[in-house]
Amino acid sequence: MHHHVKKSYINSQFGQVHYQIYGEGIPLILCHQSPSSLDMFNSAYPVLASLGIQSIGIDTPGYGQSDGPNSQPKILDYAQCVVDVITSIGYDKVSLLGHHTGACIVAEIASFRPGLINKIILNGPPLLTQDEKQKMLQMIEKAPSLTLKKDGSHLLKLWNKRIKFTPGWTNLDAMHNGIIQMLRADKNDIFGFKAAFDQDLESVLMRIESPTMILTNTADDIYFAALRTKELRPDFIFKELQDGTHDIVDEQPTQWSKCIADFLK
């Protein structure tokens, strides 16, 4: 079945923000992890559409085909851009899903614009201690920066870097697409991580009053943080898929989409 896809841009504080609308049905905003783009949900868009969900994928400023900030933004800045997309399309109320950094953005929106929201899905919320944030940031900052080489060896370096950050990976398409998104994000690909680590996610989570589901998978690199979120907010629905990595959408698109549809309906 062919589903209608509409791609568009809106103006934001950082320039133009790119988004796409896929299918018809219950509107669901999708916010991606870092460094990625709305393409991280490509395997799920048709499945969600077949389940009666209209997906609105958004490229966070600085990623995918959105213009980027020149200096370090906060999660609140990214969140405001997502709200701008929602209001510009004209939705009264939407549900939102965010994966990793996207979960930070979605939680932020739920805490400062609750009137816009039907339901929230936190996919792998990065509820980390200061120590864990510090270690992860050091790992990310220590990774060699991209210097172009005539023999193309810089591309292999990037490939190996993503493999190192994806233990237990199985999906070649997801790995390839991940590399494309890293190349697109270029020198500022760290902005999303830094914004996420700067946010006080715990206090933001405590302010959420919308119906919320934590969605995770048991071999996600921050699975433990989802369990921690469940402890913090036992009132949130908790759903976990088996195995998988941070490429779970490519690895298990049908199971992933069904969890979402069950919750939204």
Question: Which residues fall in each region the model found?
Answer:
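Flexible "cap/lid" loop of the alpha/beta hydrolase fold
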Residues: 107-112, 118-149
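Conserved loop-alpha-helix segment in the C-terminal half of the alpha/beta-hydrolase fold
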Residues: 48, 212-250
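Post-His helix in hydrolase/transferase enzymes
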Residues: 249-262
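Serine-hydrolase catalytic core
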Residues: 196-209, 218, 227-230
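Conserved alpha/beta-hydrolase catalytic His-Asp/Glu region
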Residues: 131-132, 149-206
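Conserved HGGG/HGGXW glycine-rich cap/lid loop of the alpha/beta-hydrolase fold
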Residues: 14-65
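N-terminal cap/lid segment of alpha/beta-hydrolase-fold proteins
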Residues: 1-16
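Active-site loop/oxyanion-hole signature of alpha/beta-hydrolase fold enzymes
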Residues: 50, 57-97, 101, 258
